[in-house]
A protein has these predicted regions:
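Metallocofactor- and cofactor-centric catalytic cores in central/energy metabolism, strongly enriched
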Residues: 2-136, 150, 154, 158-163, ...
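Internal active-site segments that recognize and position negatively charged phosphoryl groups
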Residues: 140-142
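A conserved active-site cap/scaffold subdomain adjacent to cofactor or substrate pockets
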Residues: 171, 191-258
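Short, conserved secondary-structure transition motifs
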Residues: 174-181, 261-264
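Internal helical hairpin/lid segments
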Residues: 233-326
Length: 370
């Protein structure tokens, strides 16, 4: 059944033109440039796909943020996934782009080419079935994502415990949006003075998670939907706040996001996970309290603890010419990178921003090559 009739109002050209004109009219009254970070990679792709940059006035700029979980995953964690796949009688499972990102050993897809058992999942729940089908194998799920996907990992874990599936383990790489944004805003080089907050994350955690950012940094934050009309409406809301010298949290994406979020999903996560003291982010370094880990009561499912002796905890250097770090901080754009669309392409990605379908470089490569 087609859902075009539901989506089309949010892509209507006439509505976009009206919003664009309203943005330009109000933006002309701004006292200083408005630099908006769209935190989520989904927003970045919509902005590029629908040519929204071309509708913006010159005194309004988008800075692309760290809201792509694969992009910010450090090489050390990628190497651990490869090391787990290298163990005897192991099966490593992960979703989509995580399989394609190269660490210092290569990617999990390349591991498959060497005879290691690394598999794509379409749903985290498949991990339960694979573990049941392979009782004599060590099945390890590489769990990754922001607050959006964490409840699914929690559900799989809780079901594994309930069903007494003892050969399924979890390498937890679930990260949190607010601490990463806070780290960027603390940087003295940061020019960002407004935020488009992620919507899918907010469906789970609620808009409430951004309140501390508003209070601390005194900047407007709008939780925006992904469609072009959503984004332009959100930009208009940000401009109005800037003109009124306001700094508050507002929800544009009211058809899906509430202030409290999905409390049932939050309860699932809280039942088995807790905040880590530190976690390394690619391009951002170590950020305190920015990621989750399994609670001690689930230690027997924790791949980092069970297979500690097999993990090297090595670190490896990034390609010095790659500007992924600056792009993730909103300081640089993909077109500023000398590797972009030459050495670094989706077929031969050098940096994580090109590997992931949500990465800023992948979006520019697909929609805005010059």
């Amino acid at each position: 059944m087609s859902v075009d009739h539901l989506i089309s109002p949010f892509r209507d050209k006439q509505t976009l033109l009206v919003l664009s004109n309203a943005i330009k009219k109000l933006a002309s009254k701004l006292e200083k440039k408005l630099v908006i970070m769209e935190v989520c990679g989904g927003h970045t792709h919509s902005i590029m796909k629908y040519g929204l940059l071309d509708l913006m006035p010159k005194n309004l700029e988008f800075a692309h943020g760290p809201g792509c979980p694969v992009c910010v995953m450090p090489r050390a964690r990628l190497d651990e996934a490869y090391e787990l796949a290298s163990m005897k009688d192991s099966i490593v499972l992960s979703l989509g782009d995580m399989m394609r990102v190269p660490g210092s050993y290569g990617s999990l897809i390349q591991a498959r080419g060497k005879g290691l058992d690394a598999r794509f999942l379409y749903s985290p729940m498949q991990a339960l079935e694979i573990a049941k089908e392979n009782p004599h194998k060590k099945v390890i799920y590489i769990a990754i994502g922001f607050e959006t996907t964490t409840p699914m990992s929690a559900s799989v874990l809780l079901n594994a415990k309930k069903e007494k599936i003892n050969n399924l383990f979890f390498h937890i790489n679930h990260i949190l949006v607010p601490p990463s944004v806070s780290a960027i805003l603390e940087d003295k080089a940061c020019q960002i003075n407004a935020l488009l907050a992620p919507s899918h994350v907010s469906v789970i955690s609620g808009a409430q998670i951004y309140t501390p950012l508003v209070d601390r940094f005194k900047l407007p934050i709008i939780v925006s939907g992904f469609e072009p009309v959503d984004i332009l409406e959100s930009v208009l809301m940000l401009i109005k706040q800037a003109l009124n010298k306001e700094a508050k949290l507002e929800i544009q994406y009211k058809r899906a996001v509430s202030f409290e979020g999905n409390t049932k999903a939050q309860e699932l996560v809280n039942a088995c996970m807790e905040v880590r003291e530190n976690f390394e982010w690619r391009g951002l370094g170590n950020i305190k309290h920015s990621a989750l880990k399994l609670k001690e009561s689930f230690a027997s499912y924790d791949a980092e603890k069970v297979f500690k002796a097999c993990l090297s905890h090595k670190t490896s250097k990034e390609n010095k010419a790659c500007k992924c770090a600056e792009i993730l901080k909103g300081i640089a754009k993909p077109l500023d990178c000398s590797l972009f669309a030459t050495t670094c392409t989706p077929q031969n990605p050098i940096g994580s921003c090109m590997v992931s379908s949500e990465g800023a470089c992948a979006a520019y490569y697909r929609y805005k090559r010059v």
